[in-house]
Amino acid sequence: MAIDGKHYLSGDEYLHDAWRLAAAVMSSGWKPDILIALWRGGAPVGVALHEFFKVSGWDVRHIPLKCGSYTGIGENAGEVVFTHGDIVFGMLRKGDRVLVVDDVFDTGKTAKAVKARIDATGAEMRMACVYWKPGKNTTDLKPDFFVKDVGLEWIVFPHELEGLTPEEMRTKDPDLAQLVAECRRKVN
């Protein structure tokens, strides 16, 4: 559902789109050795892809990589920062096929930073994102796999709450808004 320039994804819609992404990767014939899910947004996508791969006959190693530059809705802090990146990138070897998974590819800044680190290992990287915003891309990169071009619309993922007003929370899910309001009253 789209309201005021924000697209509110349901959990089912997001999960089904992630499975479509997994099917697109498998249909390409390119099989990764390792799946790196970019924490936070890519984590649920990574879980869905890994499960889909596993039940379809692919056993792919997987690990999350915490990275980010966003400080809020539409607010980009600048430099991409990795937490424990040396550990994750240190696992990669020349010739490894690495599938990097994220929820959305917009500016391409995160993808570019990840690609630079993976390229330095000699591994081959491909990028899979559920959603793509080509109009926001500031790099020469694009995802190798994606499900939907979402234009410039801001996506509110099923798990996202921070930055939403009480009205937006009610729009997203009235039961959720009530739970949050009750907990806020108890805590404050």
Feature annotation, model-predicted:
Residues M1-N188:
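PRPP-associated nucleotide enzymes
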